[in-house]
C-alpha cells in the first residue's frame, strides 16, 4: 500500500471517530459545537457581537462541560458568507490555539451546511440572506467549496426553485460529519473568507 493511500485511510478513521470543535460566527450569533465520544455539546448565543470576548466564552464552555481542548483532533470554522470582522477575530484566536496545541483547523461554508439541511432536493438554488442581500448558489454546486455564488439585492420573481434562508437552520455534528466524510472542507492554509459586499 502506498503512502498516499495510508494517509487517506488514517484521515478517514480520524474523521469518523473525531473529536472536534466547530465555531460559527458568520451571521451575528455564535454557535459552538463540540463533538466528543459521539456526544454533542452545543452553545448558541443569539445576537453575539463581542468577538473580542470569544476566547473567554470558549474556555468557559469547555470547563463547564468537562471538555479538554487538548483532546480535539481539529477545529472547524465556518468561513461565510457573513460578517467579516468578528470572524477574523475568532479565526485568529483559533489559529493561535491550534498552533500552540498542534491541532488542525479546517474551514467550511454556509452553503455546505444549508445543503445538508434541505429535505426537498427539488430546488435548484439556495439563497442565504445576509444584511439585506442574497447570496445565491446552485444547489448542485454547494459541495464544491470553490464554486461561485452570486449576490443580489432581491430574489428573482420566478424563484420557486430557490430555497431561501434568512438564518442557518439548527445543525449538529451530523451535518458537519457529512462535510468531513466527503472531504469537502478546506485546509487553513488556503482559507478564503467570504466578506460582506
Question: PLM features: what roles do these ranges have?
Answer:
Residues 38-139:
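Nucleotide and nucleotide-moiety/phosphate-recognizing core
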Residues 2-35, 51, 106-197:
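Oxyanion-binding and handling regions
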Amino acid at each position: 500500500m502506498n503512502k498516499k493511500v495510508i494517509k487517506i485511510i488514517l484521515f478517514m478513521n480520524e474523521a469518523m471517530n473525531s473529536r472536534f470543535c466547530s465555531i460559527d460566527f458568520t451571521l451575528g450569533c455564535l454557535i459552538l459545537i463540540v463533538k466528543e465520544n459521539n456526544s454533542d455539546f452545543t452553545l448558541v448565543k443569539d445576537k453575539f457581537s463581542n468577538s473580542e470576548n470569544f476566547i473567554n466564552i470558549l474556555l468557559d464552555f469547555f470547563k463547564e462541560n468537562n471538555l479538554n481542548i487538548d483532546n480535539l483532533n481539529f477545529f472547524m470554522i465556518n468561513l461565510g458568507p457573513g460578517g467579516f470582522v468578528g470572524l477574523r477575530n475568532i479565526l485568529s484566536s483559533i489559529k493561535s490555539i491550534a498552533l500552540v496545541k498542534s491541532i488542525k483547523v479546517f474551514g467550511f461554508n454556509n452553503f455546505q451546511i444549508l445543503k445538508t439541511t434541505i429535505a426537498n432536493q427539488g430546488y435548484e438554488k439556495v439563497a442565504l440572506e445576509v444584511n439585506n442581500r442574497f447570496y445565491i448558489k446552485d444547489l448542485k454546486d454547494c459541495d464544491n467549496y470553490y464554486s461561485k455564488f452570486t449576490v443580489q439585492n432581491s430574489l428573482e420573481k420566478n424563484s420557486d426553485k430557490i430555497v431561501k434562508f434568512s438564518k442557518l437552520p439548527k445543525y449538529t455534528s451530523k451535518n458537519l460529519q457529512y462535510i468531513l466524510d466527503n472531504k469537502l472542507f478546506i485546509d487553513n492554509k488556503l482559507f478564503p473568507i467570504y466578506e460582506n459586499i
